[in-house]
Regions:
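Mg2+-dependent phosphoryl-transfer enzymes with acidic/Ser/Thr/Gly-rich catalytic loops
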Residues: 2-4, 192-275
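Asp-based phosphoryl-transfer active-site loop
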Residues: 2-16, 84, 233
Length: 275
């Protein structure tokens, strides 16, 4: 029996170990389909040295692609983007617009981003040296825009640095019609907030993809490491939490594997007889 596997097992900055790429390659060779299911948008994914996949779900479910074919794409309205950009700038908050065409940031992101990204990478298990290198690589990937240039109509979601958790709570109050989440480092410490279109979740995106593939949810397996991945767990038949994941995702999992940097993905693929 072939399975459809959805992966969101690591952070934005942390490269998957060689064993993970090996596991994905072997699973696909055995007839299984493997998709990345991530908060990142396509431009961010393309910057990374990932193995071959059958497709991707990006922007926490805003974008669905199968073998280079766009199955679904739902962006924020230009009006919402303008309002969020102005909201962040008024608060002197660093942010970046996540689009398939690129990652577009404001002045404050260039100032505040490196320190926050180092915290993020260290929380995901990177050494200080690697965290600094990864953070700089990530910042270098931004396209710096100013003023009206940031009012775009191709944005999947917007991530912004949290000065305190209150920034996230304020975003929920000020943008009640949008989906507000947080993401961060070890133990899901909230370093960033994000805002995306309403109705968009990883679960919804998986259901759209399964319908497109004429596939059955009983053949699905998901891998997650954070609270945002709980919606994947709601619709997939079997769910795996990474050892470096947060408490809530582990509580909801059918199986907990090792940390991603300790061959957790490869070990779980073997356990599930995908390879």
């Amino acid at each position: 029996m072939s399975n459809i596997v959805f992966l969101d097992v690591d952070g934005t900055l942390i490269e998957l170990p060689a064993s993970a790429a090996k596991a994905v390659d072997q699973a696909r060779a055995h007839g299984h389909k493997v998709y990345i299911c991530t908060g990142c948008s396509k431009a961010e994914i393309l910057q990374r040295n990932l193995c071959d996949l059958d497709g991707m779900i990006g922007g926490n479910g805003a974008y669905v692609e199968d073998n280079n074919h766009v199955v679904m794409h739902q962006c924020l309205s230009k009006e919402d983007v303008k309002n969020i950009v102005d909201w962040c700038n008024e608060r002197h908050i660093g942010f970046y617009l996540e689009a398939n065409s690129g990652m577009y940031c404001n002045d404050y992101m260039l100032e505040q981003g490196p320190e926050t990204m180092v915290k993020y990478a260290k929380g995901k298990g990177a050494s200080l040296e690697n965290a600094k290198s990864s953070a700089q690589h990530f910042i270098d990937g931004f396209i710096h825009l100013q003023g009206d240039e940031l009012y775009r109509d191709d944005v999947n979601k917007i991530s912004f640095i949290l000065r305190t958790y209150q920034d996230h709570l304020d975003s929920k109050v000020d943008f009640p019609h949008l989906v507000a989440n947080t993401w961060g480092g070890k133990g899901e410490v909230a370093l960033f907030g994000d805002l995306g279109p309403t109705g968009i979740t990883k679960r919804h995106a998986i259901e759209v993809l399964l319908d497109y593939l004429h596939a059955d949810a009983k053949d699905t397996i998901s891998f997650g490491d954070a609270k945002i991945d709980l919606s994947m767990f709601e619709c997939c038949a079997y769910n795996v939490a990474m050892g470096n994941g947060g408490f809530e995702i582990k509580e909801a999992a059918d199986y907990i594997t090792d940390d991603v940097n300790e061959d957790g993905l490869y070990n779980a693929f073997k356990y599930l007889k995908l390879i």
